[in-house]
Amino acid sequence: ARGKGGAGGAGGTGGAGGSRGEPAPEGIGDVMHRVAELGDAPGPVVGVQRLDHPDGSTGWVVSVPGMRSGAVVPGVDPMDNATNAALMAGLPDAMTDGVEEAMLRAGVGPQDPVLLAGYSQGGMVATRLATSLQGTFTIEAVLTAGSPVGSMPVPAGVTALHLEHAQDWVPALDGAPNPDAVNRTTVVRTLPGGGAAVAGTQLGLTPAGLGQAHSAWEYAGTAAEVERLADPSVDGFRAALDRVLGEGSRATSQSFLVARVPERG
């Protein structure tokens, strides 16, 4: 297991349920549905999905759910507020190490295109990995939902799509708007009422509670809405996504338990 800054233990992973075949995701909605599904698991689980394309190439989707524990003192479960604080401060964190180890254990190849998808805290982890894994893996795209990632960089060669709800204040916790860059698109949806607005426009707040506004399943529904959105910026993300998902692919999914293990002195 990997520790902060190297070997030691924090962020270790273990197989949870082995591998299973399932239908391959076909778009943004399917990807976020998987993230929401993993968030309902009984433990701190991340998913690594292998997509075997008809031409013999392979793509990978890495799914990272959100925070499970409000604990500020680091415990065994790394999906906690201690990880949030580390991510916000730019410090090493157990989740980033754990997801990287899950990718290594799953067999992700250095040249295989990878999509990193995450909800809330998981989106911060995915965005950090887009930078930290440069030179180790080929990160093609990042998909976040309800995540405060405005102050986090995304490398020029990575295409990112950020989903937010107008009534959800969690994406604003870092105090920084998402950059308006050629490789980064933000879609903000106002709940309820459907429809989506591109690049940070907010269509007026409606009285939805934070529970709904910050729900992983609500974001999965928003992702499905965005799938139907006609916009050049979203089309750019779809092109990157297609390079990972392929067409007519065969999917094999693995799930990994992630734990914060005390480093050995």
Task: Tell me the role of every PLM-derived stretch.
Residues R128, S132:
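Active-site signature of alpha/beta-hydrolase-fold catalytic machinery across serine-
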